[in-house]
Amino acid sequence: MANHDPISDMLTRIRNASEKRHETTKIPASRMTRSIAKVLQQEGFISEISEQGEGIRTELVLALKYSGKHRLPTIRSMQRVSKPGLRIYKNTRGLPKVLGGLGVAIISTSKGVMSDRDARREGVGGEVLCYVY
């Protein structure tokens, strides 16, 4: 079965795994999913990224983070913003602040995929891929 939106698929797999309190989740590897996973790791939403398999069957294995003795997921919500049917672009001044700065917007810029904070620091805008908080 062909996957027409790998970013939405990635977000859904992470969301489902964290709701079920799984330690890890597997997602098909691509340059975009690797970049998004690195941003999630830098922002503290996932603890570890590893690769499994080879060639076209390579998968990313993401170790999810939980907090407290009740193991509450670090990721409360993930929302896809720019979709294949409706792309959303913002300039530097128009970059959103998620939950007043508590969450992260992941932006695809000309300098690579980065968080909204990094994009503001670099002075670049781009496509708003998703919100994570």
From Swiss-Prot:
<dbReference type="GO" id="GO:0003735">
    <property type="term" value="F:structural constituent of ribosome"/>
</dbReference>
<dbReference type="GO" id="GO:0019843">
    <property type="term" value="F:rRNA binding"/>
</dbReference>
<dbReference type="GO" id="GO:0006412">
    <property type="term" value="P:translation"/>
</dbReference>
<comment type="subunit">
    <text>Part of the 30S ribosomal subunit. Contacts proteins S5 and S12.</text>
</comment>
<keyword id="KW-0689">Ribosomal protein</keyword>
<dbReference type="GO" id="GO:1990904">
    <property type="term" value="C:ribonucleoprotein complex"/>
</dbReference>
<keyword id="KW-0694">RNA-binding</keyword>
<dbReference type="InterPro" id="IPR035987">
    <property type="entry name" value="Ribosomal_uS8_sf"/>
</dbReference>
<dbReference type="GO" id="GO:0005840">
    <property type="term" value="C:ribosome"/>
</dbReference>
<dbReference type="Pfam" id="PF00410">
    <property type="entry name" value="Ribosomal_S8"/>
</dbReference>
<dbReference type="InterPro" id="IPR047863">
    <property type="entry name" value="Ribosomal_uS8_CS"/>
</dbReference>
<keyword id="KW-0687">Ribonucleoprotein</keyword>
<comment type="similarity">
    <text>Belongs to the universal ribosomal protein uS8 family.</text>
</comment>
<keyword id="KW-0699">rRNA-binding</keyword>
<dbReference type="InterPro" id="IPR000630">
    <property type="entry name" value="Ribosomal_uS8"/>
</dbReference>
<protein>
    <recommendedName>
        <fullName>Small ribosomal subunit protein uS8</fullName>
    </recommendedName>
</protein>
<comment type="function">
    <text>One of the primary rRNA binding proteins, it binds directly to 16S rRNA central domain where it helps coordinate assembly of the platform of the 30S subunit.</text>
</comment>
